[in-house]
Amino acid sequence: MPALLLAALLAAAPSPQFETLEPVPAAAQGEAIPACTADRRWCALIEADESDEQLMLRLYDGAPDGRAPVTSYPIESEVSEGFWKPGAVLRRAGSDEIIVGADMELQSMYSGGGGMSSHRTLIRFVPGAAPQEILTVPLSGSLMIRACFGEEDMKQRAGACHDEYEFAAELKAEGDAFPPRLTYASTAATFPGRVSRSEDSLAKPPLKPKDLVKAVDAECSVRRVFTFDPAANAYVPDAPLPDCGDYTVP
């Protein structure tokens, strides 16, 4: 093939991008809900196996409609840990190789507060090979921790009776390679001002109105680039991700 023609074909091939998997109504109440690409070329669902102890990610070539999955992958998580759902896919142009993003949502409620978070796990599906888990990153977190237990506490806190933690991240694909390069950008902030779950907020000096602002956490507001390492069969970041459990562990 002439070099110019090959270059033109490569330029015409779309760069891989995350496609959101849209839920498709289940046939019966209580059934696992599949989620599909807009063209219904690929569908996935997450359900417990026959023992009801192991979660399985099922991948379908088209809508399930009673057909057998192309392949299945056991998700390493107890059913009770969180709620899993198919989130997105990356497709390789001209190939049946795809990467599925499975999203796990965690929720916790406690006296006077609560929180939720989500993580995305990427699983690579290559025809003729066993599926491989290649990356897990936190995507979101939102927590409220009770900080007032009486009228005096309300005065000390200037009416801000909860410590709040907010975390949001975005994962994007870049370039023409497959698996593609991924960029990960996160933003984290607390309110009122800089607070920490490892400290007693009531042990600090009384708050003033000027203290009732959000404070960006620079340590957990980061940008990372992940490249796929064939030897490790996994994505590797250009620098380690920080421990942001204050935001991502409800």
Question: Predicted regions span which residues?
Answer:
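Acidic, small-residue rich beta-repeat scaffolds with periodic aromatic anchors
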Residues: 13-29, 35, 113-118, 125-250
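Short N-terminal edge-element motif at the start of the domain
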Residues: 43-100, 104-108
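Beta-propeller blade termini
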Residues: 30-36, 82-94, 170-174
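Entry beta-strands of beta-propeller and related beta-repeat scaffolds
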Residues: 40-43, 95-100, 176-184
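Contiguous hydrophobic, core-forming segments of folded domains
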Residues: 93-126, 131
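Beta-strand-rich domains and repeat architectures in extracellular enzymes and scaffolds
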Residues: 26-49
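Sec-dependent N-terminal signal peptides
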Residues: 2-11
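Hydrophobic beta-strand positions in blades of beta-propellers and related beta-sheet-rich domains
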Residues: 55-61, 120-122, 223-225
